[in-house]
Amino acid sequence: MALHLLYAVVIIALLFPWLSENFRTRIERRWNRNLMGILNIKVRISGAAPDLSVQNMMLVSNHISWLDIYLLNAVRPVRFVSKVEVRSWPVVGWLAHKTGTLFIDRTKRHDTARVNNEMATILNSGGCIGVFPEGTTSNGSLLKPFH
């Protein structure tokens, strides 16, 4: 897994600045799918499967594990909204920034307007936004219902 992470750092640092968004998206999706394979995780959708080809999609989900982000990106390219503190995390914060994560400073109420504008721009251009409204991960036993 460490080699897979190193591969991502090298590709993003050396190639991403010169690649089209479409090509970067394909690389990200393949990397995420390979990560699921390395971890022996199989994606299974139960119930009514959503049409993931739809443009302008917002995914709203509970956040059980750090794997949620990679699993969703293995199925469909997603730009996530994350707390600004993640940006300063070693390696993962840099990768999140370089792959288009929107960071929000939850201590500054006015930052919501900035992030909302960025989300609108992404959605209006056909992108997909992912949010975890609980704002944290949990073991899943105390998940709160959506209303």
Where are each of the predicted segments found?
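A transmembrane-helix-recognition feature enriched in membrane-embedded lipid enzymes
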Residues: 1-44, 94-99
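Soluble catalytic domains of membrane acyltransferases
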Residues: 37-147
